[in-house]
Amino acid sequence: CDYHFRLTPKQRISIMTDEFEEWFVDEQMKVAVDFPGYDLKQKKARQTTGEEEAVTVGLAKINHLPFVLAIMNPYFMMGSMGQVVGEKLTLAFEEATKRKLPIIVCTASGGARMQEGIYSLMQMAKISAAVQAHHLAGLLYITVLTDPTTGGVTASFAMQGDIIISEPKAIVGFAGKRVIEQTMKEKLPDDFQQAETV
């Protein structure tokens, strides 16, 4: 149909892989953040999605060929990147490096999770360091940009893939279109921040 469609990690796993074994599900990765309403927002996201966090990672296979797969969930707090997301992605890259496997990351994010402040921004450097170690080991990293891929995710690991592909007309950018229009006091083109124009 030449257009993107937002999918959950489970949906994406079912169409992308023959086998999938999820990692880091039993880990008690919790963050203590004193931001008003944050606990309630996380609880609601868990109830709505049936997921613990905004990323699912694990070992996948296509035609018996293994690779590490990480899929961000746009339905869990808009796929925002906090400390748990950063830790799971970092561990995924480290495990891929240790096992000498390629990794595919399907990005979908509104950016850094504002409720976690500077700790969410630190995940950009943390994940990027793990990406670099994987790269220096001579291993393949493929990024699949899905709708939306914005903010700190775009500014870090989303654009570090050896191969970067995108869903048609997916929103890809750093700051949101409205923020840029308000700052520049100009109307931007309709196709601004579509994958085809990035």
Language-model-derived ranges and their functions:
Residues 55-135, 142:
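Cleft-lining beta-strand/loop regions that shape enzyme active-site pockets
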Residues 21-43, 63-78, 98-105, 134-147, ...:
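Charged, low-complexity, helix/coiled-coil-prone segments
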Residues 4, 8, 84, 122, ...:
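Conserved active-site and cofactor/substrate-binding residues in soluble primary-metabolism enzymes
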Residues 53-56, 159:
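Glycine-rich, charged/polar anion/phosphate-binding loops
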Residues 1-51, 59:
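Intrinsically disordered, low-complexity segments enriched in small/flexible residues
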Residues 38-48, 87-88, 107-112, 156:
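N-terminal-biased segments
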Residues 107-197:
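Conserved catalytic cores of soluble enzyme domains
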Residues 1-7, 78-80, 189-190:
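Short, exposed beta-strand "edge-strand" segments with a Pro/Gly-rich flavor and a Y/T-containing core
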